[in-house]
Amino acid sequence: MVADTVHVGQHLAGHPSVHLFGHEIVLDVSIPALILSTVGAAFLLRYTLSIFRLFLELTVLPGKDIKSFQSRKGETWAVVTGCTSGIGLEFARQLAAKKFNIILVGRRQSALTDLSKEIESKYDVHTKSVTVDVSTPGSARDDALTQLELLAQNLDVGILINNVGASHSMPVAFHETERSEMSRIIETNVTWTYLVTRSILPSMVARSKQKGAPKSLVITIGSLSGRIPSPLLASYSGTKAALATWTKALAEEVKPQGVIVELVQAAFVVSNMSKIRKSSPFVPTPAPFVRSTLNSIGLPRGAQGRPHERTPFWSHAILDYVVGFAGYVSEMAGIKVILGMHKDIRKRALKKAARDEKKAE
């Protein structure tokens, strides 16, 4: 049976009425209240579904299989920058465990040699090493980029992990930051990331644009300091924000050619750069952080609504999601909390430096 046309009218008391199946139904609410209730219900539904999606992505939904980026087992290579400690070291190990050959990029040749021996003996894969100080422009860095470009042209490079990064030695006001420190941060976090990606990406595009070819993957490690402006780390925070915009633009450029480009957002992780030595639920060691990153390719988790970004580790994802939930209010609250935290860190760092200086006298 087909229902009569639904007709919304105005009842004598100013309440809306609906004609359905030949009967008039009077709603005991005013039209403005009905509109507000409908809008409120829509927002409630939206956020309920969003939270449910976050829960599913953190618990049961799988990301894209990392092995899908391999052409043939044992022949595909992954490039990992900043690979001799922390997150980069763990990326090299876990990708090798998945039978990717590894191109190791780092500053210290001795550390690269030791890591190369470890990976080849433990995981039965091949390695190559490129030694470079990424923070220093010049012929040595240019030579390293040329070397990486040639390796990408001659090997089946399917993954690039832009991990290497630099931050301030301690929180500091922007107008008091040494120029040398500022340059080191910009050259490492932005300039090198752009240049190394430019060197390797053409070969990845050529590899993946063919019909039936495996996709390629570029992962750049970002920071929630770029997501939430971080006073007293302004230079570092700005470089990480730049990487987010660059990633989104680049991802759309190369998506039709079969290359996936993602920015992975991270909060604190136990590492030399963070200067944190003890793990906690909100500060993981590199191993679980990298595992969550490789297991969630394509899933935004805490970065919902931000294309080509993801926040993979569960506690970082919840933090990112909460900050975005209330928009301006939560972001401003986050900025104030971060400023207070950085003031405290700076105060303690200056006291320690003073004690060390006194001991050295």
Curated annotation (Swiss-Prot):
The keyword RNA-binding does not apply. The keyword Glycoprotein does not apply. NADP(+) binds at residues 79, 133, 163, 198, 236, 240, 269, 271. It is a single-pass membrane protein. Its EC number is 1.1.1.330. It catalyses: a very-long-chain (3R)-3-hydroxyacyl-CoA + NADP(+) = a very-long-chain 3-oxoacyl-CoA + NADPH + H(+). Pathway: Lipid metabolism; fatty acid biosynthesis. One of its GO terms (molecular function) is very-long-chain 3-oxoacyl-CoA reductase activity. It is an enzyme of class 1 (oxidoreductase). It holds the Pfam family adh_short. One of its GO terms (cellular component) is endoplasmic reticulum. Keywords: Endoplasmic reticulum, Fatty acid biosynthesis, Fatty acid metabolism, Lipid biosynthesis, Lipid metabolism, Membrane, NADP, Oxidoreductase, Transmembrane, Transmembrane helix. Gene3D superfamilies: NAD(P)-binding Rossmann-like Domain (3.40.50.720). Its main location: endoplasmic reticulum. The active site is at 236 (proton donor), 240 (lowers pka of active site tyr). GO terms for biological process: fatty acid elongation. Disulfide bonds: none annotated. It is found in: Endoplasmic reticulum membrane. InterPro entries: 3_ketoreductase_fungal, NAD(P)-bd_dom_sf, Sc_DH/Rdtase_CS, SDR_fam. The chain crosses the membrane at residues 32-52. Component of the microsomal membrane bound fatty acid elongation system, which produces the 26-carbon very long-chain fatty acids (VLCFA) from palmitate. Catalyzes the reduction of the 3-ketoacyl-CoA intermediate that is formed in each cycle of fatty acid elongation. VLCFAs serve as precursors for ceramide and sphingolipids. Belongs to the short-chain dehydrogenases/reductases (SDR) family. This is Very-long-chain 3-oxoacyl-CoA reductase. It comes from Cryptococcus neoformans var. neoformans serotype D (strain JEC21 / ATCC MYA-565) (Filobasidiella neoformans). The lineage of its organism: Eukaryota, Fungi, Dikarya, Basidiomycota, Agaricomycotina.
